[in-house]
Amino acid sequence: MELRFLKLSDSQNIVNVESVHYSNDGTVTLKLSDKRKLKLAAEVWSGLEQPRDNPLTDSQQEILEREACYTMIQNKILSFLAVREHSAQELRRKIKQRFYKIATCDVSALVERCLQEMQEHDFQSDERFARLFTESKLSNKPYGHFKILQDLQKHGISREQAQAVLNEFGNQGFWLKKAVDCLVLLQKNTNH
């Protein structure tokens, strides 16, 4: 479905909702008289208590535009999280790359609102991301303490949080053994 947005200041026409289609996923798609289609949360549409035959006010159009943007951002974030854990910083970057052309709403504010909601419902967690990322690096590659710490910080995990996660995986003896294992592996690879 293609969603088109108009700058509201350019729109001098009266806009009506021509049709409303409810989906099983809790969204509603509105077909407007200016040929736009907006998909947003059904509760937002219900909250406007807008009869279909009445023209939309400018403020109602702004709300619908903003909520349609929010729904697109939310769906994209959920699709990223369905594949693997992401840090909040990764999600911000990916969403801003995909939605940079939308001029009708403040994408950054909507991303922050969505991330806050995702964190409240435990769909996104930087701590969980850090644990899974560290576990992956320890099991798949010969990474040491400082390399993992640096990589976590590149993903937006604070040094303190990254250090706490690394401490969960082992003490100084664990990391020293890991470093020795890396050196042995490196020596084997250079001798062949």
Q: What role is predicted for each listed range?
A:
Residues M1-H192:
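An alpha-helical, amphipathic repeat domain used for nucleic-acid recognition
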